[in-house]
A protein has these predicted regions:
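Short, intrinsically disordered, charge-balanced linker/junction segments flanking boundaries
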Residues: 136-143
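N-terminal Rossmann-like NAD(P)+-binding subdomain of aldehyde/semialdehyde dehydrogenases
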Residues: 1-133
Length: 143
């Protein structure tokens, strides 16, 4: 049985503020297949605070840096494809072949979509030929 009781906040695994757990039930066996921690408002506040802090530097990353990070994430996802399929199969009670062939692909498809959007996205729009120096810049706003 899987036991995942810590949260990844601010670049490290941390112990939740409260010891409240949930047994994840596999619908196909009706048995507990994992134990996870339930977050408190303190955990949520810590995560949001960390995200806001991370945004300060993330907002200044270039398109190329973001593409490189997303490509690394996609590569890692593909390497751990079978682990994803096993986790999905346990949680949803789906046959492993179905999880491996279809459901695990959903996460990979999302990452590929983000890559395509980022590659094609125009962060700068010239308002017209008559005023080539007049531009609209699209910049990150926040978390």
């Amino acid at each position: 049985m899987l036991s995942k009781k810590n949260f990844y906040i601010n670049g490290k695994w941390v112990i939740p503020h409260q010891e409240k757990e949930l047994h994840v039930i596999n619908p196909s066996t009706e048995e507990s297949c994992a134990i996870i921690s339930l977050g408190s408002s303190e955990d949520i506040n810590s995560a949001v605070s960390a995200a806001k802090k991370a945004f300060e530097s993330w907002a200044f990353t270039s398109k190329e840096e973001r593409l490189k990070l997303l490509e690394s994430l996609y590569s890692l996802y593909k390497k751990r494809w079978n682990e994803m399929a096993e986790a999905i199969s346990l949680e949803m009670g789906a046959p492993i072949d179905f999880s491996t062939q279809l459901q695990a692909g959903t996460g990979a498809s999302h990452i590929k979509s983000y890559l395509k959007v980022l590659k094609d996205y125009k962060f700068e729009k010239i308002l017209g030929d008559h005023a080539p120096n007049n531009k609209i810049l699209y910049e990150p706003k926040g978390v």
